[in-house]
């Protein structure tokens, strides 16, 4: 006879993620590219439990908004906050123009007060590394126009602080190159950014597994954005669910407070009172 065991009824206190003037209970964000089809994308988004979904404005433009094949028209936006992004922009000026276009698209589908933009300025077509100066220039202008700016950057603590001081609602350092699945290759710098930040730090790019997402959350990241790891998995909805669990576990562990690493072994069983006979 096979025994079954119920999971613990314990419910950890998970604090909300605050970005600008909005609160979110999920700390996992998802991108919308690379899925096999619309149905798989929708199932993955649901399985992830995410509340923030980022869509490339250029891809939304190139698809017919009224088309049933377009992801924008295929989701229940009452449960999801849309974050347009400026992917594909190579200059600050181009990113600014696309950010304004993204804001108009969100209004057209009912997000009247949505000023979110994921700012990407990427002139490097091979490694897809962001332009720090271009990002800062674009961010300063967009903040002045009442955008809630979430900038994608290298794991540069100085730039992260400059963007925070410019009024960005978060900073989004890359863990490793976009789509690489290499995890947190810039761990030390990301830790410095988190330590110095007064805004949420969202680890964006390079997350390949739930354990890597958990690692980011364990060091105090405010959230994680994943795309390729989910969309290219053999079972995308299953991976989306696993990513949700990884983020939840990492955040709960961070709040719990981990033990300090030691050089010597420490017995887990008490030695006081043992018989010496």
From Swiss-Prot:
SUPFAM superfamilies: ThiG-like (SSF110399). It is an enzyme of class 2 (transferase). CDD domains: ThiG. One of its GO terms (biological process) is thiamine diphosphate biosynthetic process. This is Thiazole synthase. Homotetramer. Forms heterodimers with either ThiH or ThiS. It catalyses: [ThiS sulfur-carrier protein]-C-terminal-Gly-aminoethanethioate + 2-iminoacetate + 1-deoxy-D-xylulose 5-phosphate = [ThiS sulfur-carrier protein]-C-terminal Gly-Gly + 2-[(2R,5Z)-2-carboxy-4-methylthiazol-5(2H)-ylidene]ethyl phosphate + 2 H2O + H(+). The lineage of its organism: Eukaryota, Haptista, Haptophyta, Prymnesiophyceae, Isochrysidales.
